[in-house]
């Protein structure tokens, strides 16, 4: 895969995961040009906080993941009016947050790399979805 949009579920797994999917995701992201909406940083921070509070990862692991985050994503995109409009059109199939990733992948004509099986199973999405679990 040359280029992709990557969502927060995939990024959190790549940064803080310990299983086979984390290894696969790290490899895919290293070899690809990765894109994401600006929302990604807030979602990753939120997920890492939850993981620390539930003792899934340590504070140090979360800090290391946050420190690595800026270098993992090649291009971040603002929530432009055009992207928001297209995101809103997808509201019947996925959450607004997930739709931002789908809309960006569609606009860039690249696959969406996700660790979210519910997103991957959503019907009628206009972009290719690659689930890594």
Swiss-Prot record:
Leader sequence residues: none
Statement: the UniProt record of this protein carries the keyword Metal-binding: yes
Ligand binding (Mg(2+)): 7, 98
Molecular function via GO: magnesium ion binding; RNA nuclease activity
Family classification: Belongs to the PINc/VapC protein family.
EC number(s) per entry: 3.1.-.-
Any Pfam family matching the protein: PIN
Superkingdom, natural source: Bacteria
Top-level class of the enzyme under EC nomenclature: hydrolase
Cofactor(s) required, per the database record: Mg(2+)
InterPro entries the record matches: PIN-like_dom_sf, PIN_dom, PIN_Pae0151-like, TypeII_TA_RNase_PINc/VapC, VapC_family
Keywords: Hydrolase, Magnesium, Metal-binding, Nuclease, Toxin-antitoxin system
Documented activity regulation: Inhibited by EDTA.
Name of this chain's protein: Ribonuclease VapC1
Function: Toxic component of a type II toxin-antitoxin (TA) system. The cognate antitoxin is VapB1. Has ribonuclease activity.
């Amino acid at each position: 895969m040359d280029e992709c949009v990557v969502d927060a579920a995939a990024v959190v797994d790549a940064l803080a995961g310990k299983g086979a999917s984390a290894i696969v995701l790290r490899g895919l992201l290293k070899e690809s040009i990765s894109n994401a909406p600006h929302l990604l940083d807030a979602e990753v921070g939120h997920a890492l906080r939850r993981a620390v509070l539930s003792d899934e990862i340590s504070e140090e692991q979360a800090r290391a993941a946050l420190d690595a985050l800026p270098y993992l994503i090649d291009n971040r995109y603002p929530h432009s009016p055009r992207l928001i409009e297209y995101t809103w059109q997808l509201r019947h199939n996925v959450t607004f947050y997930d739709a931002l990733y789908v809309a960006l992948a569609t606009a860039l004509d690249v696959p969406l790399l996700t660790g979210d099986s519910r997103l991957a199973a959503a019907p009628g999405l206009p972009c290719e979805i690659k689930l890594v679990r």
